[in-house]
Amino acid sequence: MFSASIERAQNEAPFPIRQGVFVAVAGPSGGGKDSVMAYARERLGNLAGEIVFARRIITRPFAPGGEEHDTRDVPTFEREEAAGAFALSWRANGLCYALPAALDEEMRSGGVVVANVSRAIIPALGERYAHIFPVIVTAPRGVLAERLSRRGRETRDEVLSRLARSEAGELDVPGALVIDNSGPLEQAGERFLEALRKAAAWSDVCDMV
């Protein structure tokens, strides 16, 4: 009776949401997270209806060929943040980032949500969602430096700062699946696609508990 009461109280609490699986994709700038995610997204097959790729809100203008995201200026971002419009928000590299609060309903429906996030917010994700599957997409320093220089979005000092963060062990996440994306995209993409299949299977089990 006592354990049943605890379980009922847990299920009635708003957070952490105990349905669904959140696939938290992190890694150093230049690691190719967006490319790996796009590769898998195009090949979901019959899992397409179960997996949602979150669209981030960022205080950065949209650039052709870059990540598709919703843009806000800083004052608007901060107003929406204060109003509870975001499931989670964070600051990094001089920008503000957020995930929309609508993802809570996707999780409660028992689906799989995939999002590009900062490693630093993964503990906070665990407070909001009970089932987190962290994935780190990375590459050696030389590959990161080449990619960052090629995309031309950061200054030299910003590139060096991002490389220093990856070397400082900032991307170490206990229990994470680490994907090396220094070779052909297909190799990393297939590993990530397999991770999504496992996340979908895990979500099915979560829904039965």
Curated annotation (Swiss-Prot):
GO terms for biological process: 5-phosphoribose 1-diphosphate biosynthetic process; organic phosphonate metabolic process. Signal peptide: none annotated. One of its GO terms (molecular function) is ribose 1,5-bisphosphate phosphokinase activity. Keywords: ATP-binding, Nucleotide-binding, Transferase. Gene3D superfamilies: P-loop containing nucleotide triphosphate hydrolases. ATP binds at residues 27-34. SUPFAM superfamilies: P-loop containing nucleoside triphosphate hydrolases. Belongs to the ribose 1,5-bisphosphokinase family. This is Ribose 1,5-bisphosphate phosphokinase PhnN.
